[in-house]
Amino acid sequence: MNETREEQLLSAGRTVEAEKKTDVEALKKKYAASEEKVYTVVTTVQVDDETENEFTFLFKKPKAASYDRYVKTMSNSVTKASKSFTFDNIIDEQRDMLRDTVEEYPAITISIADKLLRMLGLADTTSVKKL
């Protein structure tokens, strides 16, 4: 009986994941047709040694005002700055999904903010050479 219940739970989980992927694909199509620059950000959270959760979000390209708020807030709290910056730029349809994800994995906003900053030109490597 436990195996049957476990199979039902796994099946329900797969159904939910399939629905999420369908929703993301529909949103991608919607925003691909618009003038707005929207990017897909996929992040994987390692829950434990055997489990990983993958999340896919769509973000608008950050505007200068959003970046300025991020830099201003960073001096007080990197966590708050990353969270605000991430929520500033998520598409409206995924705001609740992001909120739920952040409740469970609060550090995810730091990873996402890093990717958003790279859209604005943050580089891993910058070199200087004396002439």
Where are the language model's segments positioned?
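Short, charged/polar N-terminal "headpieces" of proteins
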Residues: 1-61, 130-131
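Short, surface-exposed, charged amphipathic helix/loop patches that serve as local interaction elements
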Residues: 51-131
